[in-house]
Amino acid sequence: MAAASSQGQVMQNTNYQQELQHAESLLAGLTTNDIPHHIHYDLTLYDREGHESTATYDIYRDPILYERTEIKAADYQLTHITNVRDHVDWQHYTGDVPLKILDFERAVILPRTAVDRFAQEPQNIKPMQMQQLEDTPLLCANDQAGTTICFSPLIHLFAYAQMFNRTIMYDQWLPIGTHSVPGSIHIYQDKKLLVEATGTVEAVSKFPDHFMQVPDAPSMPSPESQYKIIKSKSLDQSDARYGNIQVEVSVDEKGHVAKESIIDSDDKHLEGAARKFARNLVFEPRMKDGQPVPFDASIYVEYYPFFPPEDQ
């Protein structure tokens, strides 16, 4: 899925930061002048063994006021409401976040992981160049170290992102007011499909009463706030690969990991490094009735090495 260079003579902006800002100004949810809307995605997810499952992902936005996200994926169900004006968040969920939902959340609307990487290394981003992907012209920026972001020069929106062997493809952009959302998102690991998302968007004249309001019931704490890691060793990131790994750990009374197992992973090549990393974690002991007790936790490991650019 690598994009091949093109010698097209069309004059285009070659400054990545300017193109990114232009794209973000066109995306629904990233500015304050959206119209109220509802985005719905039907997801097909594939686990480490290739088993298929389905999920739905809904975003309801009343700009400047509220945003509501609902995810339904087998045993995992989430409702998250944000009072944008008062900066109040509320959530209720069941089960653990499936790994492929995490992958999708980092790619919905824009390739957040790649954008964040570029933000950490602006000095490495060269002037963008025109390239071709399956006969489609793209305007691409790369860091010479494994990460590429490509825009469609015709609509100034994201088309493609690559982090080593991870590929994210955006297509069928859908208008909503003066903004857009991707109607199609595909996430690949090497040539293996991990996530397929098909979306729709509609304007909403009025949301049901109380639908967007933060409930009086207390918000559930985030899963990661239920434990505290007090000691860790660096993750071995010597392979030029990208991927996320979900690991279940059994922690003893002293906070040491007694057992670790892979729940799901994007890339089996990375499981050994993730297990070793998890095995060496030390948690703050969990107390019950004044006594330390064992517990289980699900952790998510991101494997995204940083190598010096090839031309340095």
PLM segments and residue spans:
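N- and C-terminal low-complexity/disordered segments
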Residues: 15, 19, 53, 60, ...
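Short solvent-exposed loop/turn micro-motifs enriched in small/polar/acidic residues
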Residues: 50-53, 73-75, 123, 132-135, ...
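Contiguous hydrophobic, core-forming segments of folded domains
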Residues: 62-112, 177-179, 188-193
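N-terminal leader/targeting segments and the immediate start of mature chains
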Residues: 2-56, 60-63, 121
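Flexible, processing/modification-adjacent segments and terminal tails
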Residues: 11-16, 84-148, 153-157, 162-164, ...
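Short Pro/Gly-enriched beta-strand edge/turn motifs at strand-loop
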Residues: 39-42, 109-112, 122-123, 167-168, ...
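Charge-biased low-complexity segments
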Residues: 59, 66, 76-77, 84, ...
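Beta-turn initiation residues at beta-strand->coil junctions
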Residues: 43-45, 70-74, 90-95, 143, ...
